[in-house]
Amino acid sequence: MFKENAKKVETIIKTSEEPQSSRLNGFQRLKECCFIVGVLSSVLLAVALFTFSPADPSWSQTAWGGEIDNAGGLFGAWLADTLFFTFGSLAYPIPFLLAAAAWVICRKRGEDEPIDFMLWGTRLLGLTVLIMTSCGLADINFDDIWYFSSGGVVGDVLSSLALPTLNVLGTTLVLLFLWGAGFTLFTGISWLNIVEWLGDRSLAVLAAIANKFRGSEQETLEPQLDEFVEDKVSTKHVEDDQQDDETLPHLTAYEVEEPKEKAAVHEYPIYMPQAKSETSAVKPTPEPQPQRVAAVNATPTYVEPEPQLKAVSTDNVDPMVERTKQLNVTIEELEAAAQQADDWASEEQTSQSYADTNAVYQEQVQAKHEEVVEHDTPQLESSYAEYAQFAAQQEQQLHVEPTPHEEPVIDTRALDDITDHAEPSEHIEPTISDFDVVDEEETYVAPQPQSRSPEPQPMVQPQSVSQIQPEQAPEPSVAFEPAPQEVEVEEVQDGDQDVAAFQSMVSSAQAKVAATQNPFLMKQEQNLPVPEEPLPTLELLYHPEKRENFIDREALEQVARLVESKLADYKIKADVVGIYPGPVITRFELDLAPGVKVSRISGLSMDLARALSAMAVRVVEVIPGKPYVGLELPNMSRQTVYLSDVISSPQFEQAKSPTTVVLGQDIAGEAVIADIAKMPHVLVAGTTGSGKSVGVNVMILSMLYKASPEDLRFIMIDPKMLELSIYEGIPHLLAEVVTDMKDASNALRWCVGEMERRYKLMSALGVRNVKGFNEKLKMAAEAGHPIHDPFWQEGDSMDTEPPLLEKLPYIVVVVDEFADLMMVVGKKVEELIARLAQKARAAGIHLILATQRPSVDVITGLIKANIPTRVAFTVSTKTDSRTILDQGGAESLLGMGDMLYLPPGSSHTIRVHGAFASDDDVHAVVNNWKARGKPNYIDEIISGDQGPESLLPGEQMESDEEMDPLFDQVVEHVVQSRRGSVSGVQRRFKIGYNRAARIVEQLEAQGIVSAPGHNGNREVLAPAPPKD
């Protein structure tokens, strides 16, 4: 406070002085020139030293005809060589010391500054000692720099003189103490002050750590006036200070005591995941809660504002203390205090008069309250009865059926008679309801007439009586006498009846249209605003609040000891060597004793789960890169991994591929992503409710966050019509979402034809994959030589010239329920999928197959051989886990997105906690893409004809094969017998098996029988002939 005031006064004095001359005198000019020369010299020295080359000619090196690498030229090479030879590696700080010395000497313009020769002499002596001892220490402890000694010739001479006598340790100690003495001589800083400063910093750090662990705020030390304040003054505090002290947490005895030393217990290494967000340990101050005010007192109470400068009793305070406080107050605060004092004087008068008025008002309310309480209950009941009778009569008299769209006209002249019955002496203040104070629950609600007009009009309008509201009971002292009411209804003319009928028809039609356009139904066309961003943003996804992962070390160590004891019960000696807590599970790494097989622990997984009271325990037999066995236990409270957490991770942001997919987080909380282009196909399997469909949606959403329709396209097959139909209308789709399994075969066959077409184009351009194809098209377009379609022929299109080749996007085929597709369409789908899985990688066509029935008749060996990447959610048995992953473990998963990921080219599974995307997240991303454009469907994908390029090996076109002579007879037999098996046709017509099979295939091509199902039977599709 004193320093701020002193600066303020000094500033005022400076502004009152005459302006100084802008010209420099002679001595000032000389000092400024010396400063410029010093800075220039330091820059030249730095350039020469940092660009030194041993090959340059110098004082210690001779060279002829070579180029000089030093940026300072020949002079710089000689200068740097001389400094390195003299001081060694300590030549690098010389330019900085020279610039600092120039600044210190020339920073003041004063001419009449006395020169203290003693001070400058000690500084020069200290600088000399510092340089010599530093060179000596560098020569002893550091390696040589190029062909110079690390301490230069100065350090070499000192070490050669001291080493024979003092040895290395003694020489180092002597030079260190001399260095400390030189530092004090040069800077004038006492080492005692340095030690005190270090001690203060250390204590402050320890106090901060203690407060952080204790969870309390840091103490605020208030300055005390030890010289002036007496003991009796210290007991008096300002009210604000007392309130501040009350808000601070008080440290009790058990919070301050040090914990007692526990017995020596084995500590387990716990590897904590990296915290996502750090929160302050200081708890926020609780906000003041609003006080409840009684309902009787409806007038606000005037609260006098508290002044900023509190008046303290100065009876027992020394006058010096008061003067010290006045010195600490600034001029602005004194002016504000004076202005506020004037305001207080006027406000006191206003508050006094307001208080008097409020007191009179409270007396009136109390008197009126007592008057109401004195009324008996029978009087209240009689008032209710009279009012109910009056309301019933009014309802009977006013009950008239109006014609459509015509409001009844009520004669309001009779209403004036009602108001005359109200006595003017019964006037009550409308602002306060005395009856509500007596009993707020027994409120009478008057019945409302049903045939009134839409706009409510008051039936009774008393001038001196408080208006009766539905929520408020009438005053008991008011009695109404019913009067006959006359209602006049206007006659409806004949011409208006047609208009009313037409309007009713229009309104009914509009009501029907509004019923069909329910806002909760999926609309085909939506007017959505076009986003400005090229890709969807993170604001579309749900962002959970900041979660803190509280990990109890003692609980984890207790579980580790329990694991060791339970394994010991089964005669297995193992030690827990590492604990890795994660968001869903915690992995305990076990070091088995010599001779213990891993198979013994694997067979005890269910027993360990029972002994540890866990849902499931998974044993990781091999941890890559470690000689330990993993034991994965579920956490007591699992965390939800949201899609926004993984998409905002650096792993996903740094990925450049448009086919990047999100899987979730591993056991350490790190994001796990993959690239479908490198998989190149993925098989997803799991039971119902294990998170399989959510995982597929997360994969699709992650690709929508990375790729535009020019880079990626989808073909979606959804037999359940629920999971993938939500993506209908996004511009990434090549065709509508396939829900009919008969159309799914055409879609897969179109993919085979597209794959063959792409292979022909890539072979013509001499590239090996889609990425190289697109890059070559880009290079050709930039060079001004666009590439035309080499396989175009006249008649293929209406163009007269071959069209230009366009960029080929990646195509991802998503099948949500592969088992239903196999069941309906049959084995032909398996052949198409196998062919795509074998060859479609280079063509940029990738498959995502999901099934909830991981059996061998669905996931066949042909499919598993061509789809190396698998994702297994929770399954029922170990057999299903082996069907998917060729190993067990999926039966021990926890469900709700818990999965095992088998990456391509690896036999070790990775446990991943799948990311969660809600329906709102999916709708938000889908609507964002729908607003950007409409899809461009290709009709041939679903309803296209079978082309020759899409046929499987051995297939023939339908037109290339002639009908069998027995075809008509076989059709008649199959339609009548309703059996279309090959063996039945063979026995009935006594032909060979191959001929019968060929005829049945012709029947299938003509749509008479269906394709063979999973059991080999065919269904007769043609209707039966009519019976005579």
From Swiss-Prot:
The UniProt entry, under SMART domains, shows:
Ftsk_gamma
Question: Which biological process annotations from GO are given for this protein?
Answer: cell division; chromosome segregation
Per the record, membrane topology reads:
Multi-pass membrane protein
Membrane-spanning regions, if any? 35-55, 85-105, 117-137, 145-165, 172-192
- Give the record's keywords alphabetically: ATP-binding, Cell cycle, Cell division, Cell inner membrane, Cell membrane, Chromosome partition, DNA-binding, Membrane, Nucleotide-binding, Transmembrane, Transmembrane helix
What residue ranges carry the coiled-coil annotation?
Answer: none
Q: Binding residues for ATP, per the UniProt record? A: G689, S690, G691, K692, S693, V694
Provide the family line: Belongs to the FtsK/SpoIIIE/SftA family.
Its subunit composition reads: Homohexamer. Forms a ring that surrounds DNA.
What is its biological role?
A: Essential cell division protein that coordinates cell division and chromosome segregation. The N-terminus is involved in assembly of the cell-division machinery. The C-terminus functions as a DNA motor that moves dsDNA in an ATP-dependent manner towards the dif recombination site, which is located within the replication terminus region. Translocation stops specifically at Xer-dif sites, where FtsK interacts with the Xer recombinase, allowing activation of chromosome unlinking by recombination. FtsK orienting polar sequences (KOPS) guide the direction of DNA translocation.
Protein's name in the database: DNA translocase FtsK
Q: What is the lineage of its organism?
A: Bacteria, Pseudomonadati, Pseudomonadota, Gammaproteobacteria, Vibrionales
